[in-house]
C-alpha cells in the first residue's frame, strides 16, 4: 500500500470516505468544518481606565487602569497603556448579537418637552395679535401731507406682541352667557273663548224618559252630548243660587282661620324612646300600646280615612262653596302607605293646563290657596278619593252561615229524604221482574267468527240462530266496513313508510324489492357529487353483482364484495378519477334491466299470476279446419265477389280459366310412420 503524502491529510474528511473534497468544503464522506469558538474568544474582556491627567495621583490609572484591576495585567508597561490611553476598556461589549429580550433598556432624554396646551396657546396668541393689529389700524389715520414719500422707502411691520396666558384677564378667556338657554317646550295655556251669541235659540237640555242629558253646541253649529270624563270631578251646585240671609251676621275671616286652626292640634313628642332606653324593665304592654296609638295619629287628614261620625259630605255645607274647586281637575290618584299622590291640572296655580303629579302636602296647599276652609279639607279629599277609587263590595256572608258555631242535627231530615226516595221503589222492582220474560234469560256473548283472509274475509252467522235477515245484513255490513277501515289504515301506513324510504339515503330502505338499471345509474351519479365516501347496495344475484361492478368501473369507482351467501353485497367507494365513461354506461344500459333482491321476498300482491296456456288435443288424421263455419253473407269479401258475379260453389277466375271449386284438405299427422295412405 502506497504511503499517502501529507498534503492529502487536510483534503476531505478524516473518515473512511474515498473521494472527499477540499478541506473545509463538502465532499463525499466529509462535511464543512468550522472552527468552534466560545464566548470568551469572541469577545475578550477590555479593562477600563478611569484615571484623570489633572490629578497627579490618578495618572497611573489613566495609563494602566484602575488599581483594583492592575493585578490582572502581567506587568505595568507603557506599551500596554499606550494603545488606548484614557479610554482603556471603556467600551463595553456590543449588544447587537444579543436577542431583544436580553438587551438592556436605554433611556434617552427628549429634545423637546411635550406640552398638550402648546397648540392652544399659539392659537390664543394669534387671535390676540390679530385683534391688536385691527385696533392699531383703526386708530391710525392716513397721512394728509402732500409730500410724496420716496419710492422704495416703507415702514417695517411691527413685530407681533406676545402675551402670556397668565397675564390675560378672565374676560378674554371666558365667555359669560347672560341670555340663557331658550326653553324648548313651552307649556300650553287654555284660554276660555267667549261664544258669540246666536240668533237661533238653543236648548241645552234633552229629556229622554226620566233622564236629562246636557247638550253643547260647537262653533260649526253641531250639537253633541256633554258627557263628563270618567275620572274627572264635576261639582254640581246642589243649592242653586242660594243667597245668605241678610240678618245673619257675617263671621270675620280671622275667626274662620282660628276655627280651622283649632282642628289641627300639635301634640308633644312621645317619650317612648326615653322609656325604652331608661325604663325598659318597668315598661308594660299597655303603656306601649297607648304610646304607639298616639304616634300613629296623623296631624293631617288623609283621603282614604273614615270621616268622623255626623260629618256631612263635601258639597252639603255652605262652606264648601266659598272656594271654586272646579279650577282643580284631579284625574288620577296613587295610593301610598303614608300619603297619597294626585294627578292635578290647575291653570290658576301652575299657569298652564298640563297635568302633573303632586304630593299630599302640595294638594292641601292648592286647596287652601283657592279659599277652601281647612275644616272642610278632609271632606274634599274624601270626595276625591270616592270619585276615583271604586268602593269595595262587601263579602256575602250568607254562604258561610253553615260554618257557624251552632250545631244543627240533620239526621231527622236525612231519614225523611230516604223514606221519600224509597217510596214505591220496591213495588216497581217487583212489577218489572214479574212482567219481563227476557230479564233473567242467559245469552251467549261469544265473539263473532270470521272465515277467510284479506279481501275474502267473511262473517259467519249460523242460519239456525234467532237473528232475522235485517240484523244479519246489518252485521255483515258492519264487519265489511270494519275490515275496509283496517285495510285503509294499513295502506296509509305503508304509503307513509314508502314515502319516508323514498327520501332516505339508505338503499336498503329505498329499494325494498329490487332495482331497475336506471335506478342504479341515478344512484351512482348522485354518489359522485355527494360528500359520502362509500355506497352499499343490497344483495343481488351473481349476474346483477357483475353488472353493478361493470357500471362502477365505468363511473371510475372502486368496487368490492362484502358478506357471504345470500347476504353478499357490493360496496362502492370513490377513487381518484371522477370522469365517467358514458359509452360503457350506455352499452350496459341496453342489457339486463331489472335486478331483484335475493334477501327478501316480494309480497303476493306484487306477483302477477301467470295465465295458463291452452292445451289443444288433436287426433290422428283429422282434417285441419274441418269444424270451421262457412263464410257468412255479412262478410265484406264475399259481398264484393258476389257483386263481381261469383256464386257459391263456383271457382274463382275468368271463363275458361277458373280455379278449383273444392279446397284442398290438410290432415293431422302425429305419428312418425311416414307418408302412407290412410282411409
UniProtKB/Swiss-Prot annotation:
<dbReference type="InterPro" id="IPR000467">
    <property type="entry name" value="G_patch_dom"/>
</dbReference>
<dbReference type="GO" id="GO:0030686">
    <property type="term" value="C:90S preribosome"/>
</dbReference>
<dbReference type="InterPro" id="IPR051189">
    <property type="entry name" value="Splicing_assoc_domain"/>
</dbReference>
<dbReference type="GO" id="GO:0000398">
    <property type="term" value="P:mRNA splicing, via spliceosome"/>
</dbReference>
<dbReference type="GO" id="GO:0030687">
    <property type="term" value="C:preribosome, large subunit precursor"/>
</dbReference>
<dbReference type="GO" id="GO:0005737">
    <property type="term" value="C:cytoplasm"/>
</dbReference>
<feature type="region of interest" description="Disordered">
    <location>
        <begin position="1"/>
        <end position="40"/>
    </location>
</feature>
<dbReference type="GO" id="GO:0030688">
    <property type="term" value="C:preribosome, small subunit precursor"/>
</dbReference>
<feature type="domain" description="G-patch">
    <location>
        <begin position="633"/>
        <end position="679"/>
    </location>
</feature>
<dbReference type="GO" id="GO:0003676">
    <property type="term" value="F:nucleic acid binding"/>
</dbReference>
<keyword id="KW-0539">Nucleus</keyword>
<feature type="compositionally biased region" description="Acidic residues">
    <location>
        <begin position="146"/>
        <end position="156"/>
    </location>
</feature>
<protein>
    <recommendedName>
        <fullName>Protein SQS1</fullName>
    </recommendedName>
</protein>
<keyword id="KW-0508">mRNA splicing</keyword>
<feature type="region of interest" description="Disordered">
    <location>
        <begin position="242"/>
        <end position="315"/>
    </location>
</feature>
<feature type="domain" description="R3H">
    <location>
        <begin position="514"/>
        <end position="576"/>
    </location>
</feature>
<dbReference type="GO" id="GO:0008047">
    <property type="term" value="F:enzyme activator activity"/>
</dbReference>
<keyword id="KW-0963">Cytoplasm</keyword>
<feature type="region of interest" description="Disordered">
    <location>
        <begin position="76"/>
        <end position="161"/>
    </location>
</feature>
<dbReference type="GO" id="GO:0005634">
    <property type="term" value="C:nucleus"/>
</dbReference>
<dbReference type="GO" id="GO:0030490">
    <property type="term" value="P:maturation of SSU-rRNA"/>
</dbReference>
<feature type="compositionally biased region" description="Acidic residues">
    <location>
        <begin position="406"/>
        <end position="419"/>
    </location>
</feature>
<dbReference type="InterPro" id="IPR034082">
    <property type="entry name" value="R3H_G-patch"/>
</dbReference>
<feature type="compositionally biased region" description="Basic residues">
    <location>
        <begin position="16"/>
        <end position="32"/>
    </location>
</feature>
<comment type="function">
    <text>May be involved in splicing.</text>
</comment>
<comment type="similarity">
    <text>Belongs to the SQS1 family.</text>
</comment>
<keyword id="KW-0507">mRNA processing</keyword>
<dbReference type="Pfam" id="PF01585">
    <property type="entry name" value="G-patch"/>
</dbReference>
<feature type="region of interest" description="Disordered">
    <location>
        <begin position="391"/>
        <end position="419"/>
    </location>
</feature>
